[in-house]
A protein has these predicted regions:
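Conserved ABC ATPase "signature" C-loop
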Residues: 223, 464-465
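ABC ATPase NBD coupling module
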Residues: 71-88, 114, 233-238, 324-334, ...
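Q-loop/switch helix immediately C-terminal to the Walker
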Residues: 93, 100-114, 346-360
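Conserved ABC nucleotide-binding domain
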Residues: 131-146, 371-387
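H-loop/switch region of ABC-family ATPase nucleotide-binding domains
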Residues: 204-205, 445-447
């Protein structure tokens, strides 16, 4: 059987610096290959080189064969003609892949109409509507991309790439930002694509996703393959020290953090309720935040976690209730965005953006180098624009930017969703160490239940319950509204074993509670 993808001796250079060295891989019909490794290790560079859309400042070498079409890695024009029909890409930044001016239903419909063309007797509109419904997006057909949560935008992009019918799928962090139930469904859809004969190249930091997809796995570190083999073998009995450390660094193995110590009140919210697009997200939420406090925020994709943060930060007015803030500095409340690319000026170097920030708020630039060292970032990285660094590196730069202003409250919206497990641990340690030194409160949005439980016993949980129970939680003395956690989502492995579990959907309508 001929291969759908063959990569030989792929290398990528930025001037004299080697970013990727002698990468090789082969994929046949129905096979899966998953790339794991540190942020900035070169995983996305492999996908970009295969697609032929590397940044102009980078130089590629090696040979890439897609089906019967063979070309040198630097001959990008030869592969761009295969986009959509032979290669489908699910990008790491879904908002950048969607037309910001077009409703999502029409975007999927156009893929069926102009790219697929052989989709069968059903109309493109019907196929598009069914595709969105299958991914839990009923009622969102007329929404524009900016009206969707990060997880919803990821699912729309996923529906578009599957609609193309391309035999080779490249999925760059396909489950990033999704709750556990939707992650299970996306993995199930990827496995179905494999059963239908697609070849699948996946980039992920989620080792459970890698294990569920099976096939082969390659581990990259500093642009080189350090280990490869059958997924079950590599993840259960890793040989390379980096792979061993990566497997051991999952949040479920972390020691719990000590409880919060009582401190001065920063913010109090009473009876908060909010709707978006005619949908009630939450209501009756009472919440107080004290200096130095840690609170985890969790719930299904699209349930209002980011909206809650925007309310607390003063970026949106609440539909119901009131918020009293005891921090008066204009930069005292800071946000780490789920998609950091959208939070930086695209044509400025990162250094210029950070220097301008320091000048605006009269902060010493000298602190920047120390923060970069703590976050494992080289100073030379700042000479690039936002598009010239990986998503994980950019998120760490965003964290450095927030810490420069010494905020009283940080709303961290999935700040480690782009990071490998080791870098996630390092980044959260820096965040917590800096927050503790400055008595900054941190609200952490996460879909990882292990990470949420490690971070804090106080959890804001947005789900479908009609109203929160406002009894006190004596276990940690919190004065938040409290309610028990929603029913547990089955493990990914179990969800993939049974059709019933694979079809489980997280509820959509969401009052709020805190545990």
């Amino acid at each position: 059987m001929s291969a759908l993808l063959t990569v030989r001796d792929l290398s990528v250079h930025a001037g004299r610096q080697t970013l990727l060295r002698d990468v090789c891989c082969t994929l046949h019909e129905g096979e899966a290959l998953t790339l794991i490794g540190q942020s900035g290790a070169g995983k996305s560079l492999i996908a970009q080189a295969i697609m032929g859309n590397l940044p102009a400042s980078l130089r590629a070498g090696g040979e890439i064969t897609i089906g019967t079409a063979s070309s040198r890695a630097e001959d990008v024009a030869a592969r761009r003609g295969l986009w959509g029909r032979r290669i489908g890409l699910l990008p790491q930044e879904p908002w950048l892949a969607l037309d910001p001016t077009m409703p999502v239903l029409r975007q999927i419909e156009e893929t069926y109409r102009y790219v697929r063309q052989d989709a069968g007797p059903l109309s493109p509109a019907r196929l598009a509507r069914d595709a969105l419904a299958r991914l839990g997006l009923q009622g969102k057909e007329r929404h524009l991309p900016h009206q969707l949560s990060g997880g919803m935008a990821q699912r729309v992009a996923f529906a578009a790439v599957l609609a193309s019918g391309a035999p080779l799928l490249i999925a760059d962090e396909p489950t990033k930002g999704l709750d556990e139930a939707m992650r299970n469904e996306v993995v199930t859809l990827l496995r179905e694509a494999l059963l239908e004969g697609c070849a699948l190249l996946t980039i992920t930091h989620d080792l459970e996703v890698a294990a569920a997809l099976g096939g082969q796995v390659q581990v990259l570190q500093n642009g080189e393959q350090v280990e490869s083999g059958a997924c079950t073998q590599v993840l259960s009995k890793p040989r390379h020290p980096y792979t061993q450390a990566l497997v051991a660094a999952q949040p479920k193995h972390w020691a719990p953090l000590p409880p919060n110590a009582p401190a001065r009140l920063l913010l109090a919210a009473e009876g908060l309720g909010q709707s978006l697009g005619g949908q009630r997200l939450f209501e009756g939420l009472d919440l107080s935040i004290r200096a130095g406090e840690r609170i985890a925020v969790s719930g299904p994709s699209g349930c209002g976690k980011t909206t809650l943060g925007n309310l607390l930060l003063g970026l949106l007015p609440p539909d119901q209730g009131r918020i009293i803030r005891h921090e008066m500095r204009p930069h005292g409340f800071q946000k780490l965005y789920q998609d950091p690319v959208a939070a930086f000026a695209p044509r400025q170097t990162l250094r210029r953006s950070l220097r301008d920030l320091c000048a605006l708020h009269r902060q010493p630039v000298a602190r920047l180098d120390g923060l970069l060292d703590d976050l494992g970032l080289g100073a030379g990285l700042l000479e690039r624009p936002p598009g010239g660094v990986s998503g994980g590196e950019l998120q760490r730069v965003a964290l450095a930017r927030a810490l420069l202003l010494e905020p009283s409250l940080i709303f961290a919206d999935e700040p480690t969703s782009r990071l490998d497990l080791l870098t996630q641990q390092q980044t959260l340690e820096v965040l917590l160490r800096s927050a503790e030194a400055r008595q900054s409160a941190v609200l952490l949005v996460t879909h990882d239940r292990h990470l949420a439980r490690w971070f804090s016993p106080a959890q804001v949980i947005l789900d479908t319950r009609s109203n929160p129970d406002t009894t006190a939680d004596s276990s940690h003395g919190s004065d938040h509204s409290v309610r028990s956690l929603p029913p547990g989502v089955p493990p990914l492995s179990a969800a993939l074993r049974t059709p019933q579990a694979a079809q489980h959907r997280a509820p959509r309508r969401a009052p709020a509670a805190v545990r």
